[in-house]
């Protein structure tokens, strides 16, 4: 499959100017008191050189999203790559967990930042679950964070300080971090969201009935695009992840049977060209050229947008490691604040 190379952020500046068919935060109607976005302010370059970013061919179900590429024998230095794997490939040997699909799953419990933390061992890899200290199940929702390439659930949980970021969001939710593909050769671990939810309940952890928000970084799009038709998913947040699968996300936000009830936030650095192009399709899209320092800096139109596109000033990995993006965006969801 032919390699798709993401264009660096500096070249993509022109891609941030949305065409007339896409609403921007400063477009009429007249701005409300929170509207302070100035389109005359140039978008700053990403923090340092672009981190590696996934390339992707089209999805298995939507091959037209990308022309069929041929993968390189090794990653190009300084670039992330994510593409769709259409054929089975050999994998490194990994320890196997015996699992009949029904019995109780083993978990380890500890306390992290004052909240209960569980690491569940499944046949599809580790699943981390964290409850904030003041969690109230009666009004709680669920946040599922899917990591990108070159890490796993354990690595992302530890190195990206996810518990710290989840706590900083002040949202009343159970936070779930499952294993996901760590490279092009890995299969999607949880192609069906219902199986992931079942694994959590098999560890004797009760899921709340509130809103479900899915966050995916980079190559996580391969997993998230397979969950768009799940009846419980209310909102998806793509963090520099729109490399492919546009048809799936179109179904989620526009053409699917439950699209009227959904919201999508797209944050882009390495994927700015693809993400801006996707947003231009929709008259209801609202664009913003920087991540705000807090949710309060978002205008009412931005907060209420069915599709919010943000051109990030943070580069690919800083989007998920800086602590400036995930907590802020979780406050622009249907979750209840603590």
Located regions from the model:
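Sec-dependent N-terminal signal peptides
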Residues: 1-26, 30
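A domain-start/cap signature at the N-terminus of enzymes
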Residues: 29-141, 173, 294
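Active-site machinery of serine-nucleophile hydrolases
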Residues: 139-199
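Alpha/beta-hydrolase fold nucleophile elbow
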Residues: 206-218
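Hydrolases whose catalytic domains are alpha/beta-hydrolase-1, hotdog thioesterase
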Residues: 222-227
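Conserved acidic catalytic loop of the alpha/beta-hydrolase fold
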Residues: 195-209
């Amino acid at each position: 499959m032919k390699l798709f190379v993401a264009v660096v952020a500096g070249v993509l500046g022109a891609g941030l100017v949305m065409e007339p068919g896409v609403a921007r935060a400063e477009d009429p109607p007249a701005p409300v008191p929170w509207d302070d976005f100035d389109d005359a302010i140039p978008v700053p370059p990403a923090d340092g050189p672009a981190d590696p970013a996934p390339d992707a061919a089209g999805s298995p179900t939507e091959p037209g999203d990308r022309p069929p590429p041929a993968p390189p024998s090794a990653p190009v230095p300084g670039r992330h790559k994510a593409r769709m794997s259409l054929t089975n490939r050999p994998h490194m040997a990994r320890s196997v967990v015996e699992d009949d699909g029904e019995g109780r799953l083993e978990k380890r419990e500890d306390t992290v930042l004052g909240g209960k933390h569980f690491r569940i061992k499944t046949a599809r890899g580790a699943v981390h679950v964290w409850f904030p200290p003041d969690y109230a199940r009666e009004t709680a929702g669920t946040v599922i964070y899917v990591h990108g390439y070159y890490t796993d659930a354990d690595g992302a949980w530890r190195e990206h300080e996810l518990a710290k970021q989840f706590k900083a969001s002040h949202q009343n939710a159970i936070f779930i971090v499952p294993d996901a593909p760590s490279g092009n050769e890995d299969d999607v671990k949880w192609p069906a969201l219902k199986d992931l939810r079942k694994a959590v309940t098999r560890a004797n952890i009760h899921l709340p009935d509130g809103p479900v928000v899915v966050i995916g970084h980079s190559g996580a799009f391969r997993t998230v695009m397979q969950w768009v038709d799940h009846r419980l998913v209310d909102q998806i947040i793509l963090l520099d992840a729109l490399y492919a699968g546009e048809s799936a996300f179109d179904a989620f936000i526009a053409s699917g049977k439950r699209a009227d009830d959904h919201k999508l936030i797209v944050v882009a650095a390495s994927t700015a060209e693809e993400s801006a192009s996707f947003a231009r399709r929709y008259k209801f899209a609202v664009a913003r050229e920087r991540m705000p320092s807090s949710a309060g800096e978002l205008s009412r139109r931005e907060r209420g947008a069915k599709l919010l596109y943000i051109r990030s000033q943070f580069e690919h990995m800083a989007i998920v490691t800086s602590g400036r993006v995930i907590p802020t965006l979780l406050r622009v969801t249907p979750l209840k604040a603590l």
